[in-house]
């Protein structure tokens, strides 16, 4: 086992209706935000649940939801231009993996003098970043707690992973109620991906007792959620259990190393843009 070095970042708030605290928490890092949002949230009526807490706290914001089917560099350049011209204090990302990836990359490159393609080709950002607040609407994200961002190179359509500065994401608000709009097939696919993430983290040569502890608990929670029927000892709703399991699996994977299944999933998502 490798040496154990513990540094918890970002702050994580997980539970039903935690999105209502978005406004009061966002004020800690600024009062003017760009909200990058998955367009499906507007169609399902979820978008207002995210923006309402900001309006209540008199936080200035504008929403960008013109996302393509992949977290590509062309969309990233559009986001960077809007963010820089708007003089924002930070970015709030609400959605799945591609939304969070674009927001994280935008925060990392906000003060950089070069385009995103210089970093796609191997450069490393060194300038200061702006704060990122993540509101995931899926149960897992393999790169959320790492200093890496998966992107699609618009020039070639290939998947690339760029390195970012540490400590970009300041807060993760994980609200299971935001995931209720997922279809049964989407939930099943994400559950399978979460299980694959947990398995490869547990078998990783870079695993630690901390990552093993998180993964074992994640698998236990997934088994409770899959059972579906409440018992005298387990009364937590399945959607909350799945969210807790996904969060722990993401943390466990980040504390060791991603493996073949994560990279295969990234490649498939980039290739078929789903």
Which residues are covered by each model-predicted region?
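Glycine/serine-rich anion-binding loops at beta->alpha junctions
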Residues: 88-104, 137-139
């Amino acid at each position: 086992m490798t040496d154990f070095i513990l540094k918890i970042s970002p702050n994580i708030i997980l539970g039903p209706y935690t999105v209502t605290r978005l406004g009061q928490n966002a004020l800690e890092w600024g009062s003017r935000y760009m909200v990058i949002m998955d367009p499906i949230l507007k169609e399902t009526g979820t978008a207002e649940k995210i923006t309402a807490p900001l309006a209540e706290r008199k936080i200035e914001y504008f929403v960008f939801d013109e996302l393509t089917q992949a977290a590509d560099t062309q969309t990233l350049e559009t986001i960077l231009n809007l963010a820089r011209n708007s003089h924002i204090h930070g970015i709030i990302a609400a959605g799945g993996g591609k939304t969070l990836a674009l927001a994280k990359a935008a925060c990392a490159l906000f003060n950089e003098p070069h385009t995103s393609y210089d970093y796609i080709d191997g450069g490393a950002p060194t300038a200061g970043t702006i704060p990122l607040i993540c509101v995931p609407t899926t149960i897992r994200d393999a790169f959320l707690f790492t200093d890496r961002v998966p992107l699609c190179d618009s020039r070639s359509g290939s998947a690339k992973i760029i390195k970012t500065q540490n400590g970009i994401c300041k807060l993760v608000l994980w609200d299971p109620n935001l995931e209720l709009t997922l279809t049964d097939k989407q939930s099943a696919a994400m559950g399978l991906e979460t299980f694959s993430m947990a398995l490869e983290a547990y078998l990783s040569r870079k695993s630690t007792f901390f990552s093993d502890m998180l993964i074992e608990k994640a698998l236990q929670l997934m088994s409770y959620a899959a059972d579906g029927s409440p018992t005298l000892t387990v009364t937590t709703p399945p959607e909350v259990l799945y969210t807790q399991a996904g969060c722990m699996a993401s943390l466990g994977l980040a504390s060791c190393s991603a493996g073949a299944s994560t990279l295969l999933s990234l490649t498939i998502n980039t290739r078929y843009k789903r």
